[in-house]
Amino acid sequence: MITITDAAQSHFAKLLANQEEGTQIRVFVINPGTPTAECGVSYCPPDAVEATDTELKFEQLSAYIDELSKPYLEDAEIDFVTDQLGSQLTLKAPNAKMRKVDDNAPLMERVEYVLQSQINPQLAGHGGRVTLMEITPDALAILQFGGGCNGCSMVDVTLKEGIEKELLQKFPELKGVRDLTEHQRGEHSYY
């Protein structure tokens, strides 16, 4: 469910050593399943453990997850990374904004999940997003770009070299990707 690397476990163990006896960590999602979902980690003293919590036991600590957050933390990873600029704790939760879709779900749902959980977070750095409009009977994914992607001079490269390659690799049943957007270059466009 959640991976906590050895480096992150060591970091947490040092922090927990200064807390009340028996204190562990809690991993949670605020506003799960929404575009504003945010993940967090906090201390979890023994008296804060709920009967409905799930306990994940690791070598150096336990992590508690509340019932509501659990499906949104599927495949999450917590790491403690050190580089030339210092150290930081990272929490990656690809399913926080929407639940992971079953491998047997309809193609439209699986493609939409990849767009929302993997593609749109990358496009968001430029203020952009992409929406799946339909999958045609001849297996073409019809997309519409918005935000900073609308009118961007690099949208064709993003579509063919980024999105299409990734979708065709993940979904061999797709034959291609097409852009439905009527691009209007303007102040909103990322150049």
Curated annotation (Swiss-Prot):
GO molecular function: 4 iron, 4 sulfur cluster binding; iron ion binding
Cofactor binding summary note: Binds 1 [4Fe-4S] cluster per subunit. The cluster is presumably bound at the interface of two monomers.
Keyword GTP-binding in annotation: no
Biological process terms in GO annotation: iron-sulfur cluster assembly; protein maturation
UniProt-listed Gene3D superfamilies: Fe-S cluster assembly (FSCA), HesB-like domain
Cofactor(s) required for function per UniProt: [4Fe-4S] cluster
Residues that bind [4Fe-4S] cluster: 149, 152
Keyword Lyase carried by entry: no
Keyword list, A-Z: 4Fe-4S, Iron, Iron-sulfur, Metal-binding
UniProt superkingdom: Bacteria
InterPro entries referenced in this protein's UniProt entry, alphabetically: Fe/S_biogenesis_protein_NfuA, FeS_biogenesis, FSCA_dom_sf, HesB-like_dom_sf, NIF_FeS_clus_asmbl_NifU_C
Biological role stated in the UniProt entry: Involved in iron-sulfur cluster biogenesis. Binds a 4Fe-4S cluster, can transfer this cluster to apoproteins, and thereby intervenes in the maturation of Fe/S proteins. Could also act as a scaffold/chaperone for damaged Fe/S proteins.
PANTHER family on file: FE_S BIOGENESIS PROTEIN NFUA, IRON-SULFUR CLUSTER SCAFFOLD PROTEIN NFU-RELATED
Subunit structure: Homodimer.
Family: Belongs to the NfuA family.
Protein's name in the database: Fe/S biogenesis protein NfuA
